[in-house]
Amino acid sequence: MLGSPEATPSTGTARASALPPPVPPGGWSTEPRPAPAEIDVFGLTDSGRVRRENQDHFLIASLHKLLRVHQSSIPPDDLTPLVTESRGFVFLVADGVGGRPDGAQASGTVIRAIAHYVTHLTDLYRRLDPDRESEFLAQLERAVLETHDLLLKEGLREYGGKGGATTLTMLFALWPRAYVVHLGDSGCFRLREGRLERMTRDQTVAEALVRAGALRPSEARQSPFGNVLASALGGPEATPLTLATDARRDDIVLLCTDGLTKHVTEDEIAGRLRTLQSSEQVCRDLVSLANERGGTDNVTVLVGRIRPASR
């Protein structure tokens, strides 16, 4: 559900403050990039126990340089490999807004559009350094806002106005840094040194009231405004929150839609991540737990980590 349904669609920008300030440029890690065999990522989505349609979509992709050969006199086997090792990963999760037409189409459109934009950022993230970090974040933000405009145009064309809308939470893992872009009430978490950190904040009317001092956090959890989005792609307002932070080898990241956090507490999420054996196992466990407790919404969970060195 979106707030201010009669408001004029607009775009804007903001900087997230969910985590401490990023490491200064001189503090960039010089530790080697993890090898592909060390990376363990997995994503899972489920319609839940109540909803007929799954309006969640997600994507996990590794980032490479690629040479596409159209013709050659050289045997194909002699030309491999033509894809470089991964330079990083991108995680995307989008939750179509209920109560609006084509929530599933909106979330799918956003995933496809952002994936398309990412392919055109190759040169920028390949040469990423402290001096270009702000430019990179600005490019990500621009891609998100252009996708917002795309959804508005689709809504005008298909429905004469109010079309589909969706949340979006995106994590770029580009060693030794991580970048988050966020709209709505999906979420991104990081387990570091055994402590769970929320890297995003919900963009709901209830959360805005809490920040304004008009509502206590305990009241927000029960408030009907807790399900009313103050910001979403394709909605009346789209205000991306962006964050740059450091990445460490012992980090575990988790992205999810609110179908998980409606039924599973942050303490429980932290407990599962602390005892993680594989990204797939923890995704399946958390989705199952949400469904066991009612599964009132679609639920999507993405997890990524660097495997610990074998002893």
Which role fits each region the language model picked out?
Residues 1-311:
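PP2C/PPM-type serine/threonine phosphatase catalytic domain
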